[in-house]
Every structure is written in structure tokens, then in C-alpha cells.
């Protein structure tokens, strides 16, 4: 079920005008974030930018870091990379804990 939710979160569904409205930013802000590499929206066959729920969540974090905390975009990029790395480490830890649990059950 988690993978299904992940797939739904990654599905591109919002055009740039809708994404901008959801985030209360201008479309040029989203284009700029794409230009500097903070976000990479999916492109339709007609080359229209499409944002997923996951993209929107990332952009909400970016907006919060910039607007609420005053962090500049290079700092935001570092924070986003660190958050991604922490998420990967958490997944790895969960897999290791599951494997350990299986091994313990096998001994009993």
C-alpha cells in the first residue's frame, strides 16, 4: 500500500498555474526554481510542466525555508539534499531492522 501511495504522490497532475496557486507563488517563481535545479517537474508530450503531489510538498518546504526562515536558495538545496539523504538512511535502517527481526524469528 505504501508503494501505491508513493506512486500516486509522484503522478504528474498539476499544470504550472494550478501549482503556483496552490503554493501562493507566481509561475515565474516555479520556473526559476526549475532553472536553478531545485525542482524538475514532469513534462507532457506537449512540453507542458506537470507537478506531482510530491513536487508540491517539496515546493512547500522550499517556500517555508525561504519565506519563514530566510534561507537562501543554495542553503535550501543543501537542506533538501540532506533531507533526502536522511530519508534514504531511514529506509535502509528499516530494512535492516526487518532483516534482524526475521533472523531472530528464525532462531526461535
Could you say what each language-model-derived stretch is?
Residues 1-6, 84-108:
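C-terminal regulatory/oligomerization modules of transcriptional regulators
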Residues 1-64:
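Basic helix-turn-helix/winged-helix DNA-binding cores
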Residues 12, 71, 105-108:
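Extended, charge-rich alpha-helical interface modules
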Residues 28-29, 38-40, 78-86, 93:
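A generic structured-segment signal
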Amino acid at each position: 500500500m505504501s508503494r501505491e501511495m508513493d506512486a500516486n504522490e509522484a503522478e504528474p497532475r498539476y499544470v504550472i498555474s494550478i501549482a503556483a496557486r496552490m503554493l501562493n507563488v507566481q509561475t515565474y517563481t516555479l520556473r526559476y526554481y526549475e532553472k536553478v535545479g531545485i525542482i524538475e517537474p514532469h513534462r507532457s508530450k506537449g512540453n507542458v510542466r506537470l507537478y506531482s503531489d510530491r513536487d508540491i510538498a517539496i515546493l512547500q518546504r522550499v517556500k517555508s525555508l525561504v519565506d519563514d526562515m530566510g534561507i537562501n536558495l543554495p542553503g535550501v538545496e543543501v537542506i533538501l539534499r540532506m533531507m533526502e539523504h536522511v530519508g534514504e538512511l531511514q529506509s535502509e535502517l528499516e530494512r535492516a531492522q526487518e532483516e534482524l527481526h526475521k533472523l531472530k524469528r528464525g532462531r526461535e
